[in-house]
Amino acid sequence: MTEAEVEEINAQASVLMKRGIAFLEEQRREAPIDALHCFDEALELRRRIPADHSPFQVYLLAACLFNRADALARMGDVGPTAAALASYDEGIAALQRIPLGENPLFPRRLALGLQNRGLALQARGREGDADLAEASFGDALAVLDEEYAGRIEDLAYLRGVMWLNLANLRAMRESDGAYESARDAAMRALESVSGLEEQDPNVAAAGLQARHVLCRICAQGLSRASDDEMPDDVHEATDAVDDGLEIVRSWEQRGVPFFRPLAFDLFRFGARVYARYQPQFLDEFIADNMNAETSSQDYVGSPEMVMAAHEARLLISRDNV
């Protein structure tokens, strides 16, 4: 096969891949099916090129397999999920056969394939799938920890997301030590994105979700604690809330409102923790978060935030009775 023929095949496949990705961004019920048709056609084209053509060609083949798997996983049924896992496995195996240090795109794509495989297993939820999903997330982190991954442009963000996936998974498990291991994963997610959350909204989203996991874990402990004892993780939880809401306010000042659902949850949780364990700081907590000068008028004036602040002020009233 000539290089001209390879280029022509890749050009045709690229058009199909872009079309399929556009379908996946749609909310129509049939969108994953339409996307799958595009990815299958692109895959059939790229399978015509000899596997030993080049490492980059293997990367392109794996991209087809992973996108195909993503479309199948979106369908959610048993059959498509099984097919998705098979497609993930084929793409992962293909990438593991090439020199990953040759191009930072290679380990990045492999880590994302392992992540999405883990998410598909987690969503399927059969017995043993949680263990398999955790192993897949761990494999993704192992790839990102290799020296050759150091050239990945968004490495810190990817590490944060992988640790966040582990935190979410572990927080839903009921095994001994699950909550402590979930807390550890959430803290590692925050360490990964430290100092970057005010620069990139995607990084901010990962950090805020990690704090959300920490608060959920803390809530479990608080539900078992007596009123006259302060659990060790109260300060950690309030720090997570305060830091997270400060980041939300920073993005609100720049006209980015995407974090409000997480912010409302963090605010409500923080108000309850302050009311129960540090009531002397609750009024200041409310004032800081209802200050439009440090966030935006749309944010502090939103119905959800107004209601959350009202609920928090009722906590002050009850405490002072």
Please annotate each region the language model reported.
Residues 1-9, 46-59, 77, 93-108, ...:
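Flexible helix-coil transition and linker loops at the boundaries of alpha-helical arrays
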Residues 35, 41-42, 68, 84, ...:
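Tetratricopeptide repeat
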Residues 7, 11, 30, 34-37, ...:
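Residues within HEAT/ARM-like alpha-solenoid scaffolds
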Residues 1-49, 53, 58-59, 63-70, ...:
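Flexible inter-repeat linkers and adjacent short helices
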Residues 281-284, 288-321:
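Terminal, low-structured helical/coil segments at or just beyond the last alpha-helical repeat
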